[in-house]
UniProtKB/Swiss-Prot annotation:
It catalyses: 2 a quinone + NADH + H(+) = 2 a 1,4-benzosemiquinone + NAD(+); N,N-dimethyl-1,4-phenylenediamine + anthranilate + 2 NAD(+) = 2-(4-dimethylaminophenyl)diazenylbenzoate + 2 NADH + 2 H(+). It comes from Halalkalibacterium halodurans (strain ATCC BAA-125 / DSM 18197 / FERM 7344 / JCM 9153 / C-125) (Bacillus halodurans). One of its GO terms (molecular function) is electron transfer activity. Its EC number is 1.6.5.-, 1.7.1.17. Quinone reductase that provides resistance to thiol-specific stress caused by electrophilic quinones. FMN binds at residues 17-19. This is FMN-dependent NADH:quinone oxidoreductase 3. It is an enzyme of class 1 (oxidoreductase).
Length: 211
């Protein structure tokens, strides 16, 4: 049985969001095809994801100086404890499905906060004399991304930094398989928006059967 983290980073719902429409189709089909797997949905707009701030640095510093967790302030305990929960949950999963829009050439900031929470030395990667080495070598990941313009080819290609960033992070973590499913052009070609959406949903369902 595999454990799947279905990670969505969009404030709207599947009726309003092309990425969530494809993501919902993917995960529903996945559940039908992999009935023994456990799927955990993390809606990053609803989850408590602490930003790495002064309280977090202070708490980490105290722990590194051999102070007990109970010696941290209440706010330090809450933030450091939650960050630890998120990173442990991430490491325990077998598969990751990220669902995002493309906003200002990247993804919503809640996903960056989440990546910061799980990018932990000793858990998702380690430092060696040869440099950092990823530890998640038995995982696989997928990024479902909707983007209103055309970024797969043409002059805007270099401006797409959301999927490129996730590709770099998954590689840094050692994840050997990272796929992308893109729904694009619906804002540039509004007369074809419904067709583009339906095609994205179809491709998402197909991919779910073999992911």
């Amino acid at each position: 049985m595999a454990k799947v983290l279905y990670i969505t980073a969009h404030p709207l719902n599947e009726e309003q969001s092309f990425s969530l429409a494809a993501g919902t189709a993917f995960i529903e089909t996945y559940k039908e095809e992999h009935k023994d797997d456990e799927v955990i949905h993390l809606d990053l707009y609803k989850e408590e994801i602490p930003h790495i701030d002064a309280h977090v640095f202070s708490g980490w510093g105290k722990l590194q100086n051999n102070k007990g967790f109970e010696e941290l302030s209440q706010e330090e305990q809450a933030k450091v404890g939650r960050l630890s929960e998120l990173s442990e949950q991430f490491v325990a999963a077998d598969k990751y499905v990220f669902v995002t829009p493309l906003w200002n050439f990247s993804f919503p900031p809640v996903l960056k906060a989440y990546i910061d929470a799980v990018a932990v030395a000793g858990k998702t990667f380690k430092y060696t004399e040869q440099g950092p080495v990823g530890l998640l070598t038995d995982k696989k990941a997928l990024h479902i991304q909707a983007r209103g313009g055309i970024y797969s080819e043409g002059p805007a290609t270099d401006f797409e930094m959301g999927h490129r960033y996730l590709t770099a992070i998954m590689n840094f973590f050692g994840v050997p398989s990272f796929q992308g499913l893109f729904i694009e052009g619906h804002a540039a070609m509004p007369d074809k928006a419904q067709e583009i959406k339906e095609d994205g949903i179809r491709r998402a369902k197909e991919l779910a059967r073999t992911f």
